Amino acid sequence: MRKYLAISVYLLGSIFMILTGMKIQAQKIHLHNKGYDVEYNALTAIADRVEYYLSPSDFQGHRKAKRKAFKVDRRTPAPRAKTSHYTNTGYQRGHLCPAADRSQDKTLYEETFLLSNVAPMSPALNLGAWKSTEDYTRHLSQVYRRVRVVVLVWHTESIAHRLPDSPIVIPYAFGKQVFTADTDSLLQEWFIYN
């Protein structure tokens, strides 16, 4: 089932990109973290895809963790994303795997602040619709006990739209899919322009 779903998502994504003139670039690097996996794109200096599992125990019953500073992910090739690349750009560092979803463990929480797990998001998106997807995903994990979350990042064929003086491409849109962990059935799907 998962294989066919992955193929259909890939085909739908390809059709969408053909119709809209969008293309996901190559040069991908797989980064495995304890709490999530990243498909990092060296040409855009951001992730193309992040995947993780979420259970209520991942975010419930734990005191709010102290916010950490974002860190350069040394596993990524140069030129790397740096925190200074976001300064005074009008974009925020939007988590792809939310820090709040990993608050049960200090190490898991801290690894969400690697710059390979963030992408430029408009403040309206990051604090509005994207936060709503995070909240609803937590709700689904409570209903289904455990869910699989896939976050997708789209950018236009032209990678000229970058943060000033940086290698970081500004995404065109973000997608999120939430599946049941046991049967891999699609529960919810979002596509949100940046």
Label each region the model flagged.
Residues 75-194:
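Domain-level detector of nuclease and nuclease-like folds
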Residues 9-18:
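Bacterial N-terminal signal peptides
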Residues 29-92:
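Short, His- and charge-rich active-site/binding loops that engage polyanionic ligands
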